[in-house]
Amino acid sequence: MPPAAPSVARSREGGGIGQRRLVFPKSARRTLPCPIALCLGLCLAAAAATTTRASAAAFASAGDTTAMSAFNLLHLVTKSQPVAPRACGLPSGSCRDKKNCKVVFSQQELRKRLTPLQYHVTQEKGTESAFEGEYTHHKDPGIYKCVVCGTPLFKSETKFDSGSGWPAFHDVISSEAIEFTDDFSYGMHRVETSCSQCGAHLGHIFDDGPRPTGKRYCINSASLSFTPADSSEAEGSGIKESGSPAAADRAEL
């Protein structure tokens, strides 16, 4: 007849309710060798501890799941909130509304006389590929103008190599030549630059330029035309444009 297996009993000694101890039948204590009895006792103790830990883990897991679900819900709600743009501070009747621009062209006309890239950049706020623009490494003296309406924007003396891949200038010919608008596209905040006369998109402005202004006007080559210094007049008007027919067909309202 096989020896009886030990059992687990609760001890009430010293008020220790809930504590467990191993109780071996007398027959087992008489017949089982000491090593075997010890092994059985250790196995039963390990099983009891595992059961207790499993129960605690189940409760903890349920709590963690609830907490994680609440966190995920909060995360999704937060992510779904749109970025609240700040007021761009444009004056009433700004040229960003094409009807209020001083110089207005029909889209049909612009598609005819601008290249696809020039149209995309100036009218659709596109961006040309870095280091591929016509004026990225251009160093000739002269004046850079809006490719759409011919408004003088930058002098070659203010152009510098920013290493960004686009033409960069640290100052403008006139503070009234360019308008600034808050741009929250692509999940970031930038300041867009556009021509104040026709509303053409030029690029963006940053605060990491050289002295004396500390500004960097990062401008698309496709937004610009260039007039050599030897062909320009005193005020930059009546100049023969290089690479741009924009000024010839300009219609002022």
From Swiss-Prot:
What does the entry comment about cofactor binding? Binds 1 zinc ion per subunit.
Residues the entry annotates as binding Zn(2+): 146, 149, 195, 198
The answer to whether the entry has keyword Acetylation is yes
Q: What is this enzyme's EC?
A: 1.8.4.12, 1.8.4.14
Keyword terms, alphabetized: Acetylation, Endoplasmic reticulum, Metal-binding, Oxidoreductase, Phosphoprotein, Signal, Zinc
* Gene3D superfamilies, alphabetized: Peptide methionine sulfoxide reductase (2.170.150.20)
GO terms for MF: L-methionine-(R)-S-oxide reductase activity; peptide-methionine (R)-S-oxide reductase activity; zinc ion binding
The listed locations are: Endoplasmic reticulum
The further comment given in this record reads: Contains a signal peptide followed by a mitochondrial transit peptide within a single transcript. However, the protein is detected exclusively within the endoplasmic reticulum. This contasts with other species, including Homo sapiens, where the signal and transit peptides are encoded on 2 mutually exclusive exons, and where alternative splicing leads to the synthesis of either the endoplasmic reticulum resident form or the mitochondrial form.
Sequence similarity: Belongs to the MsrB Met sulfoxide reductase family.
Name of this protein: Methionine-R-sulfoxide reductase B3, mitochondrial
**Gene from which this protein is expressed:** Msrb3
